[in-house]
């Protein structure tokens, strides 16, 4: 699992997180049997449920778009988003996209 962290109330991928996506793209090019699920999350303590659902969706879609632009076939990418309805992480880490790699 790889995590891409976002600033509060933002779906923009920070420069320091882009390197993680680049490494993931290289891994996927080397391991063509692997697929990924990208799950977006948002912080329940900010915004409302509607806003947080849209924000988590946009975060996940932005990561997927970056991977596609790096040559990863969209058939290998599943996008999922949870808004603030699922909180498996501590508060500081809720503003993230979690990427699960499967063979």
Spans of model-derived segments:
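Short, solvent-exposed beta-strand/turn patches at coil↔beta or beta↔helix junctions
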Residues: 1-27, 42-50
